[in-house]
């Protein structure tokens, strides 16, 4: 035998509480099952009760099946019966006792049959529960029926058939209307109703497969509906009416309902506030979310239907917690908005409060240990990259003697200091805003010519060697035989091309030499065999080492007598460059630029090294080139010598280089021939630039002129901001001290040169002459001729000068210079320019004063002469004592007085000087406190010029 089902467990399965126990017991009575609070059921009884409560399917339990009342068969077929319990589920809000009293007994109905129709006791707003389904729509809502309704319609048909036999008993007050015709009409109407009910039954079967229920619809049983049921019982006692009369009554009822609904619309009732409304007045919780309630299933206070949600089947247990969080956030937001903005002010302590908050923010920051920053970075950008507080960075620099603002740029030294102070690992990257060249990934890299840079000390024969390679004379065109500009040439050897870059060798052009090393593949260091390694030679080796390029040594001037190549090799070996014949890895090729010996061997060595390196580049795509030199040429405007690194540069291509932009108009090779395109490692002179680009800048080919112009403008804005930021680099203490002592003397200069590379070299050389007392202030520099605007810039200064290199002023400029009293000096050799500016600075500097000791005398006796003063009788112990010379009076090793010897006598005669071992009389100017034992020390002041 199966186990019994406890009623409490049954409630738990239904998702109901103990408060709903009475309703479940009453529903059990509807199917003939008597239950109590602690009762148990068989599984069969529990299943039927579950179907009745959940699905509305009523199956009577045979043991408790109630008997049918025969008196109810006499009721009218179009009215609703009152005595049998309705087949729809009902749950009364009144207690059980009150409900049982309101139900009439069959006996009382039988006794009052011939009297006035007995009314059922008035109920207090019962409710009717109807299942709702997920796919119900607005049209399907009123069609919800159950199997019990179909049984009810069949009972009506049986009652109508029985009413024919009891026709005479029901026609006491209105016999004319109780004829068989009306009964026949009623029968037809009942058949129609049965057919409609069958359609509804099919609709129910369609919904039987839907297991999920969204809730119960509770239909309010108000007084009007109770009156309708009572009236239906009373009317069941009356004789049957005609169909026209019935329709007339229905029409009146609907009109009354419409009037009542109109009154309710004018005076809408306010629903009572739920407990959650106290905590959440502005937030509406939508219980119907994700529950597929459609049509009239949503609760409307104006209707007589209420929807009870079935929440126990949904997995929304955390719904309430989410709603509480939302409600709390809304309350917090409202609380912040209502906050008084002055409630936390504390008078003069407001600033300290902000400082405390500032320190708290700083404590929350996590300092990064390894960062990557661009080469040129501002102070605030460095703080952001390193996740540091800006105030701490500025404070650290201030403690180190640097007065900076957040927009100032940091140099490499400052970055290294900050990295050490904050324990950071910093990698500096050159991330200036440049256009990335679109490389064709599927393109094939092709072999390209090697780029060779000729480097070395001044006058060691670099240009002459390259001239011999090209079989042309170039060095004689350079002033003083010194290369002033970078020269780039293409040389063919064994059907292979080699690109040569000739860099100036003297110290002033170290920047240009460094720039040449950045674009080269192989460095050839030229060293004169009769001169050996010099300072510029060491610098050239350092540049090549920094560029990580292989080095080949060319020992030039081997045609001279008494040369010692082994000595040169030994000097290079001391620097770490061991020759191959000494067991090292560096080639030392003996050459002669005068006779041409060894040049073929040098070229073959270069080509072998290039084959080992396997130099390749992609020829497709936009060009990327390096500007070796820029200048202004008459009739052509701004021109630039470029060497292509990747891609192809053609005539008509748009480009930009730093602040310059334009479109390639013409291209000329080193022999003066016009060409249409440049491939990797090729060199040419291009025209069509908006201005002279700085030497060493990267030229990028772009799609059109608008992109080129935009990128150049961005770069110009960046450089302008960087130049303005340099004004705050001097500390206030240093500046105020120099101004107070009038020690700082400036020489404003305007520098004009024919090429950009020469201009940079001159500027760097002049800035190296600056010191603490005098300084050269470059107020303007540019490429091109001297203009009247240049004169106006320096006209207001006393020592202003305009320096021109390889340019000459016009007649109008010379006349204006005389009016403004401005000196214009032009040069063709950079050495002459630097030496003359050095002399000018030395003239403004105060000379160095040195003392020369001349003699010494000891005081043996003193003589006081009235109206004259004290005369000291002395013996010259060292040197010569002269009249009018400066002397110090020393007593016990301490200088008592410093002055001039006013009178010098030998006995009674005045003398000019007294030699060692002789006696003399000495009188000082305006000083008489001389004692026996004092010492006179005489000296001369010698003024010497400063050196730079």
From Swiss-Prot:
Region (G2): 481-485
Compositional bias ranges of the Basic residues kind: 208-219
Pfam family, one: GTP_EFTU
Region (G1): 456-463
Domain spans labelled tr-type G: 447-616
Assigned keywords, A-Z: Cytoplasm, GTP-binding, Initiation factor, Nucleotide-binding, Protein biosynthesis
Region: Disordered, residue numbers: 61-120, 162-243, 255-285
GO molecular function, a single term: translation initiation factor activity
Ranges of compositional bias, category Basic and acidic residues: 68-78, 190-207
Coiled coil: none
PROSITE patterns: G_TR_2 (PS51722), IF2 (PS01176)
Annotated positions binding GTP: 456-463, 502-506, 556-559
Alphabetical list of InterPro entries matching this protein: EF-G-like_DII, IF2_II, IF2_N, P-loop_NTPase, Small_GTP-bd, T_Tr_GTP-bd_dom, TF_IF2_bacterial-like, TIF_IF2
Low complexity bias: start-end ranges: 173-189
Cellular component GO terms, alphabetical: cytosol
Chief place of localization: cytoplasm
Region listing for G3, in residue ranges: 502-505
Subcellular location: Cytoplasm
Chain residue ranges for the region called G5: 592-594
Ranges of biased composition (kind: Polar residues): 230-243
Function of the molecule: One of the essential components for the initiation of protein synthesis. Protects formylmethionyl-tRNA from spontaneous hydrolysis and promotes its binding to the 30S ribosomal subunits. Also involved in the hydrolysis of GTP during the formation of the 70S ribosomal complex.
Family: Belongs to the TRAFAC class translation factor GTPase superfamily. Classic translation factor GTPase family. IF-2 subfamily.
Protein name, UniProt field: Translation initiation factor IF-2
Gene designation: infB
């Amino acid at each position: 035998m199966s186990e019994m089902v406890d009623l409490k467990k049954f409630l738990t399965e239904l998702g109901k509480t103990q408060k709903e126990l009475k309703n479940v017991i009453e529903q059990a009575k509807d199917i003939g099952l008597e239950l109590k609070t602690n009762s148990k059921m068989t599984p069969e009884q529990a299943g039927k009760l579950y179907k009745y409560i959940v699905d509305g399917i009523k199956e009577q339990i045979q043991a408790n099946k109630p008997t049918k009342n025969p008196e109810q068969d006499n009721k009218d077929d179009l009215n609703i019966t009152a005595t049998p319990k309705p087949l729809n589920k009902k749950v009364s809000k009144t207690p059980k006792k009150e409900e049982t009293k309101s139900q009439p007994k069959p006996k009382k109905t039988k006794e009052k049959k011939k009297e006035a129709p007995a009314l059922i006791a008035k109920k207090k707003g019962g409710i009717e529960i109807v299942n709702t389904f997920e796919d119900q729509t607005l049209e399907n809502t009123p069609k919800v029926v159950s199997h019990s309704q179909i049984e009810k319609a069949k009972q009506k048909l049986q009652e109508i058939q029985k009413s024919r036999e009891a026709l005479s008993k029901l026609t006491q007050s209105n016999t004319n209307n109780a004829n068989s015709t009306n009964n026949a009409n009623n029968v037809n109407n009942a058949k129609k109703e049965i057919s409609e009910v069958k359609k509804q039954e099919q609709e129910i079967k369609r919904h039987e497969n839907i297991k999920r229920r969204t809730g119960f619809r509770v239909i309010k049983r108000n007084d009007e509906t109770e009156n309708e049921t009572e009236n239906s019982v009373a009317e069941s006692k009356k004789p049957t009416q005609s169909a026209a009369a019935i329709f007339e009554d229905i029409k009146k009822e609907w009109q009354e309902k419409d009037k009542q609904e109109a009154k309710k619309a004018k005076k809408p009732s306010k629903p009572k506030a739920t407990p959650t409304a106290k905590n959440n007045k502005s937030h509406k919780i939508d219980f119907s979310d994700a529950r597929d309630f459609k049509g009239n299933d949503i609760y409307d206070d104006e209707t007589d239907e209420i929807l009870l949600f079935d929440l126990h089947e949904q997995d929304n247990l955390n719904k309430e917690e989410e709603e509480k969080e939302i409600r709390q956030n809304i309350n917090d937001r409202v609380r912040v908005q209502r906050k008084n903005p002055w409630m936390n002010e504390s008078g003069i302590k407001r600033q300290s409060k902000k400082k405390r908050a500032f320190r708290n923010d700083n404590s929350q920051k996590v300092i990064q240990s390894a960062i990557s920053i661009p080469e040129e970075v501002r102070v605030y950008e460095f703080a952001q990259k390193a996740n540091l507080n800006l105030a701490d960075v500025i404070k650290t620099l201030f403690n180190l003697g640097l007065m900076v603002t957040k927009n100032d740029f940091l140099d490499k030294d400052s970055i290294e200091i900050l990295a050490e102070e904050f324990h950071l690992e910093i990698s500096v990257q050159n991330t200036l805003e440049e256009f990335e060249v679109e490389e064709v990934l599927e393109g094939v890299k092709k072999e390209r010519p090697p780029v060779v840079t000729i480097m070395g000390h001044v006058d060691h024969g670099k240009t002459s060697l390259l001239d011999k390679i090209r079989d042309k004379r170039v060095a004689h065109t350079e002033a003083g035989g010194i290369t002033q500009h970078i020269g780039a040439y293409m040389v063919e050897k064994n059907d292979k091309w080699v690109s040569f870059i000739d860099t100036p060798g003297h110290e002033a052009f170290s920047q240009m030499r460094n720039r040449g090393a950045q674009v080269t593949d192989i460095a050839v260091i030229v060293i004169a065999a009769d001169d050996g390694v010099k300072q510029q030679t060491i610098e050239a080796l350092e540049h090549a080492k920094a560029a990580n390029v292989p080095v080949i040594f060319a020992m030039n001037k081997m045609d001279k007598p008494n040369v010692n190549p082994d000595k040169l090799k030994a000097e290079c070996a001391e620097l770490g460059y061991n020759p191959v014949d000494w067991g090292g890895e560096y080639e030392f090729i003996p050459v002669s630029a005068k006779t041409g010996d060894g040049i073929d061997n040098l070229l073959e060595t270069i080509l072998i090294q290039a084959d080992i390196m396997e130099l390749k580049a992609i020829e497709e795509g936009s060009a990327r080139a390096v500007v070796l030199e820029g200048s202004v040429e008459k009739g052509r405007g701004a021109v630039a010598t470029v060497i292509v690194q990747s891609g192809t540069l053609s005539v008509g291509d748009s480009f930009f280089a730093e602040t310059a932009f334009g479109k390639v108009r013409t291209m000329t090779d080193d022999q003066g021939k016009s060409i249409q395109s440049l491939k990797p490692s090729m060199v040419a002179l291009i025209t069509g630039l908006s201005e002279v680009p700085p030497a060493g800048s990267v030229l990028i080919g772009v799609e059109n002129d608008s992109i080129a112009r935009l990128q150049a403008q961005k770069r110009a804005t960046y450089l302008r901001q960087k130049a303005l930021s340099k004004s705050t680099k001097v500390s206030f203490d240093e500046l105020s001290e120099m101004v107070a002592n009038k020690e700082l003397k400036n020489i404003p200069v305007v520098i004009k040169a024919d090429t950009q590379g020469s201009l940079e070299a001159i500027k760097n050389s002049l800035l190296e002459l600056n010191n603490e007392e005098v300084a050269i202030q470059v107020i303007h520099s540019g490429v091109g001729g001297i203009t009247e605007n240049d004169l106006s810039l320096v006209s207001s200064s006393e020592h202003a000068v305009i320096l021109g290199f390889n340019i000459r002023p016009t007649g109008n400029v010379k006349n204006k210079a005389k009016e403004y009293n401005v000196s214009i000096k032009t040069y063709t050799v950079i050495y002459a320019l630097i030496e003359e500016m050095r002399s000018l600075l030395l003239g403004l500097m105060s000379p160095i004063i040195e003392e020369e000791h001349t003699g010494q005398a000891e005081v043996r006796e003193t003589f006081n002469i009235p109206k004259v003063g004290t005369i000291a009788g002395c013996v010259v112990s060292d040197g010569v004592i002269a009249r009018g010379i400066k002397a110090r009076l020393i007593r016990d090793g301490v200088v008592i007085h410093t002055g001039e010897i006013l009178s010098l006598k030998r006995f009674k005669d005045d003398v000019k000087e007294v030699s060692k071992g002789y006696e003399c009389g000495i009188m000082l100017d305006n000083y008489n406190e001389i004692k026996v034992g004092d010492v006179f020390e005489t000296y001369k002041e010698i003024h010497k010029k400063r050196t730079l």
